[in-house]
Regions:
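N-terminal Rossmann-like or analogous alpha/beta NTP/dinucleotide-binding catalytic cores
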Residues: 1-153, 248-249, 255
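A short glycine/serine-rich beta->alpha loop
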Residues: 24-32, 231-237, 476-481
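Short, histidine-centered active-site or binding-site loop motifs used for metal coordination
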Residues: 21-26, 230, 305, 460
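A generic secondary-structure signal for well-formed alpha-helical elements
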Residues: 45-48, 52, 117-124, 149-156, ...
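Catalytic adenosine-cofactor/nucleotide-binding cores of aminoacyl-tRNA synthetases and other
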Residues: 240-245, 266-421, 497-524
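Short amphipathic alpha-helical segments and their helix-coil junctions
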Residues: 124, 228-229, 285, 346-365, ...
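Active-site cores that bind ATP or allylic diphosphates and position pyrophosphate for catalysis
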Residues: 118, 122-286
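Basic, alpha-helical terminal appendages of large translation-related enzymes
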Residues: 1-15, 29-30, 56-58, 153, ...
Length: 524
């Protein structure tokens, strides 16, 4: 059984209605690492629907969280906003300076991320956390937290193993400068929390408004209770023993809520580097990734891996292998058979679940996502055909396409061209057809190979110009020359590409002009 289906089955024991949640702090540009949580939750939501449950998928934005430091992409003038909730900070302009006309900091970084989510079929119900504070939904939770201050203090210390300061208070009010930093609580008289800030200014915050917030461990537990959350996958930092998940469960119960099922996911790492981090510069933005990775492939990267296994995200050579795996699954989906062992049945369900959950829409036909053309073949065509119409004409000639290309195939070609023209495309997969045989390539071709190439050049003049016929002509010419297929292919790669490897040789040759190819092959 796929991990998302297993989660849905487990959640069904709680009841017929589920609220599956994920969240994010909009402190900077998002990266693909964030999609582990987003897609894990969204796939569980879909699995719940497929299981016959009612389910909402909610995306909670931590817009009440403060700016913690001045990031590299911000100007030093943001120093004055440290400690201020992200919803209350102006967005940065192109020069990194605060832009009063640019909306809020939180919205500035959230908007492109939500657009990216749409492209991969994720359209959640969005809740801005500062609005939940502002409309008073947190008020009862805040009052309960303050009233039960000692109990919560004990939970956090006993579960996390860390000691809280003597003046710890389960609510952080905003000071006179709008910052959460350096503010000390002096009293509570519902609905007001009284305080004195670092400038010595005294004031009070109304818990019915967004004039302060609960500390993270209590805030998380409170929102579970407020929104009736039944499932919220969390990263291994929050899910570790003594982490915020473990403290959140008893705190949520204390606040009158029913805590969600604990589900923990591993992080995504950029291949050859550490976990993705916006602040450390180890990042691929979601818009950048989606400009080069087909959405189904991106979803498949998440869907095929259990939540507790880390993922190495690779936009280089590994993309071909991932696409190959996905295309094999779509072209020949496994089916259960009576004679199968239990282990094989589980494998079949897992793979079919991964294929199902990789689609942009729940009702999509997986074969439509491939568009009848393999990722590798499209890569070759995108490099040797300068315009899209030439690609479509080629696909019609080869039988891959009849009529006009479907939207998914057009999108795939667009992304392929972006990938090829960018920094992520693997050097070893680049194709440049040689107009003449270079000296280095010529020096690697022995007499037996020359004889094969001479014979092949003559036979290419009369063979049908399609992949199958050219492939058979290459093999028969190699056999008649006493040359093995591998050596024959290497010879052709050297002549055509100037190196000893490349895409499927018959596919490549079929895309070339007959006279030009014969001229290069016979010139050896």
């Amino acid at each position: 059984m796929h991990w998302a289906d297993f989660a849905a089955q487990k959640l069904s024991e709680r009841g017929e209605t589920q609220v599956v949640v994920s969240g994010i702090t909009p402190s900077g540009e998002f990266h693909i690492g964030h999609l582990r949580e987003i897609l894990s939750a969204e796939m569980i939501h879909r699995a719940c629907l497929d299981f016959g449950l009612e389910s909402r998928y909610v995306f909670i934005v931590d817009s009440m969280d403060p700016l913690r430091r001045v990031y590299d992409f911000l100007s030093p003038s943001y120093e004055s906003y440290i400690g201020v909730p992200l919803a209350n900070i102006p967005a940065p302009g192109e020069d990194g300076e605060p832009d009063p006309e640019g909306g809020s900091y939180a919205e500035f970084f959230l908007r492109p991320f939500l657009e990216a989510l749409k492209q991969i079929g994720v359209e959640p119900e969005v809740i801005m956390n500062h609005e939940t504070y502002q409309n008073g939904e947190f008020a009862e939770m805040i009052d309960l937290a303050i009233t039960n201050r000692d109990e919560i203090h004990g939970i956090i210390e006993s579960v996390s193993g860390r000691e809280l300061p003597e003046d710890w208070f389960p609510y952080s009010p905003l000071g006179s400068n709008g910052s959460l930093d350096g503010v000390k609580v002096t009293g509570y008289d519902r609905p007001f929390v009284h305080w004195i800030d670092g400038q010595g200014i005294e004031g009070k915050s109304d818990i019915r408004l967004a004039e302060g917030k609960l500390p993270w461990r209590i805030d998380w537990a409170a929102r579970w209770a407020i929104h009736g959350v039944t499932c919220e996958p969390a990263g291994k930092d929050h899910g570790a023993a003594g982490g915020s998940y473990d403290t959140g469960i008893p705190i949520c119960e204390l606040l009158g809520g029913n805590p969600p099922e604990k589900m923990v996911y591993e992080w995504i790492q950029l291949k050859g580097m550490g976990p993705m981090s916006s602040s450390a510069g180890v990042t691929i933005g979601p818009m950048e990734a989606l400009s080069i990775v087909p959405p189904e492939i991106l979803r498949y990267v998440i869907a095929r891996s259990k939540m507790n296994r880390h993922i190495e995200f690779d936009t280089g050579a590994m993309m071909f292998l991932t696409a190959d795996e996905y295309e094999r699954l779509v072209s020949n989906p496994p089916n259960e058979e009576e004679a199968m062992s239990k282990r094989k049945r589980i494998s079949v369900k897992t793979r079919r679940g991964a294929m199902r959950l990789s689609q942009i829409s729940r009702d999509s036909d997986p074969s439509d996502s491939v568009g009848g053309v393999s990722f590798r073949h499209l890569s070759m065509l995108a490099q040797i055909k300068s315009d899209d119409d030439s690609v479509w004409s080629s696909l019609r000639r080869s039988g891959h396409l009849s009529g006009e290309p479907v939207t998914s195939l057009r999108s795939r070609l667009e992304k392929m061209r972006s990938w090829i023209g960018g920094d992520h495309f693997p050097e070893g997969s680049k194709i440049t057809i040689q107009s003449e045989v270079g000296e280095e390539a010529r020096s690697q071709i022995d007499e037996d190979s020359r004889s094969f190439l001479e014979l092949l050049a003559r036979r290419l003049e009369s063979c049908d110009w399609n992949e199958d016929s050219i492939g058979e002509t290459v093999r028969s010419s190699a056999s008649d020359s006493g040359l093995g297929n591998r050596q024959a292919y290497v010879s052709l790669y050297l002549v055509i590409l100037g190196r000893d490897y490349g895409p499927r040789i018959s596919s490549l040759m079929a895309e070339m002009d007959r006279e030009s190819l014969i001229g290069v092959v016979s010139s050896i």
